[in-house]
Amino acid sequence: MIYSSHSLIRYSAQAFHCLATVCLLSIASHGSAQTLFGFDANSSAQQRQMETDFDALIDRDEMDAWLRDFSSEAHHVGSPKSKENAEAIAELLRSWNYDVEIAEYEVLFPEPLARELELVAPNRFTASLVEDPVESDASTSNTDNLLPPYNAFSIGGEVEAELVFVNYGTPADYELLERYGVSVAGKIAISKYGGSWRGIKPKLAGEMGAVGTLIYSDPADDGYGPGDVYPNGPYKNDSGVQRGSVMDMPTYPGDVLTPGVGATGDVNRLRREDAPTITQIPVLPISYRDALPLLEAMGGEV
């Protein structure tokens, strides 16, 4: 897991305020055969019967139709389809006699302006950074309003440096690299998804002095290794990329500009440059198809 290739990340992000919609619903969970906490013997039996009746109303085909509709278009936070989905879910819940409120928040949500990844030595390679459509799944060809593969709340930036493979990018991995005399300081760390939450990877890499992070799904973990890839199974094909936030949630979750309070229209907000949960180095997720030429170009011990 040593290094010797070079890689270039050009990655910038634009942030804007958007409207996020949320539906909340609390449903009681099944208890044991004993008296439920907060219920006497009679009311426990009534509660269990209500839950049994509720379960009997669940229709698998109906749920499949809802899921297909909700996921038929890109529906990231603040998108038209996200709002449409929230309103549709709210109406369904109201039809079942639930009291539903859609709460509106103005949160910071970054989108990438440009994404580039190039290997410049010992040979040249330009990553595609795209996911191939799946012929049997029409939704994968619908690119209207579709955001490209990226990690939200990565800082923007452009770096060129040597590439170091850091396995899963966990503390144990960095301890092993240190024993081999390998440092990521001033370099780009490339790690596999897994082993820890993805937001920990750029956080640790930055603390170790790295100037950028690449993250890919290794096929041994999420690909042909454990089973069939999509659409024949649940695992990623060679162009699949895991998206998701890399904000420093252990510091605080939620909107990066309004720690500890709801992101309503009149609340005080941090400046973006002062938000501690935005990464300190650029992060870019890639497929294992794009990762392979980078890994093949590397030298050193394995």
Describe the predicted segments one by one.
Residues 36-49, 56, 68-185, 219, ...:
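Noncatalytic luminal/extracellular "stalk/propeptide" segments of secretory-pathway proteins
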Residues 136, 141-176, 252-302:
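Soluble metallo-hydrolase cores and metallopeptidase-like ectodomains found primarily
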Residues 15-27:
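Bacterial N-terminal signal peptides
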Residues 29-33:
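Sec/Tat signal peptide C-region and signal peptidase I cleavage site
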Residues 167-231:
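A conserved hydrophobic secondary-structure block that centers on an alpha-helix together
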Residues 1-13:
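N-terminal secretory signal peptides that target proteins for export/translocation
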Residues 58, 62, 67, 71-81, ...:
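Sec/Tat-exported extracytoplasmic proteins
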Residues 50-57, 71-80, 150, 190-195, ...:
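Second-shell loop/turn segments in exported
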